[in-house]
Amino acid sequence: MDFNIIHSIISITPERPWGLNIANYLFLTGISAANFIFASLYFIFKQKNFKNIAFLALIIAFIFLMVAPLNLIDDLTQPGRIVNVFLYGWENFFTSPMKWGVLLLIFFFFTIFLELYLSYQVVFKQKLKYQKSLFYCSILGFILALGIEFYTAYLIAILTSFIFLHTSIMPILFLISALVSGSGMLILIAGFYIKFFTKEKLDSSLFTTLSKFLACFALLDLIIRIFWFSFLLVFNTEDKFIAQIFFQKEGFFIIFVDMGLCLLLPLIIGFSRLNQKLPFIFLAGCLGVLGSLLFRYTLVIKGQSFPKTTPSFLEYHIDFSNLIGIICNYGLLIALFCLVLAFFNKNILIKGN
């Protein structure tokens, strides 16, 4: 018997249903939802700390939401298939997070668009007759933003065959992780915008506040992950052994890079005197964004690597066409942001007390 043939057969790595595009989609929608929540802190709760950048946060939410679904279309490989998502499967609506997502994305998109219009009229045109409409639109958008994060978490968590993903705390974990990346991205974009597109000086107090928010969310993220991993690795009697093997293989990436570098370090910066120094604040923002992206990558790519019909963990190789699609995705993101700046004539900071 030729054992080389047997070895070749059992070593075939099946292609994952989800790849890098899905991880990027989850990452971008998280930033969009989080920035809408930050804008709502002013438009609903009248938090003065977020007044100057509330409109900027809305723009970030809108642009990231415009670009995010393109990852889903690219992942289908045949864009015409997107029509089937709208036409079929509605009889399974209550048990299909994908169907929830179709409605949530549509309603959230139009809600952000409407809030951009209303807030521009109220804040910059001083048309106070829209104030009440802006308030109610913000409440609706706030609820939809939470729904966006919860639905994407359900997409992952209902995969019962993947033990690393199937946990009831995933919706909360997704929301907190989104707030980490959202606050980090808001720090970076606000700093870049004020530095290069306005004549104003960078207000360290604003960025100190944002770094404290980032640190709080990073702390919550760490606590939830500790609970998650402790149950997975110690108290999950059925699957803890294969989970322990997985952590022996990926532990450095998950514990030291994702949780240590990208969560613990921003936490230290935010809760120490380093939050008064802009370079460290921007470093914390970069790490927060990177950590959330790595978290999504770990869930989607590493989470699907657990063996079911194969004798070992699956290996993932990024397809070149997918990589080009991701690069084009971020190129479009930058182009849309520049277009919005041109449309509003670079006047997107809310003045006054």
Predicted regions and their residues:
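Membrane-helix and juxtamembrane interface regions of eukaryotic multi-pass membrane proteins
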Residues: 10-18, 46-53, 87-147, 152-169, ...
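TerminUS-proximal long segments
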Residues: 279-285, 289-353
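Membrane helical hairpin/interfacial module
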Residues: 28-111
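N-terminal signal-anchor module of multipass membrane proteins
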Residues: 1-45, 67, 301-302, 337-338
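Long, contiguous internal "core" modules enriched in hydrophobic/ aromatic residues
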Residues: 28, 111-276, 284, 291
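Membrane-interface transmembrane-helix boundary segments in multi-pass integral membrane proteins
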Residues: 21-26, 98-102, 170-174, 237-266, ...
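Membrane-helix interface motif
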Residues: 2-3, 73-84, 151-161, 226-238, ...
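Internal alpha-helical transmembrane segments of multi-pass membrane proteins
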Residues: 40, 52, 276-283
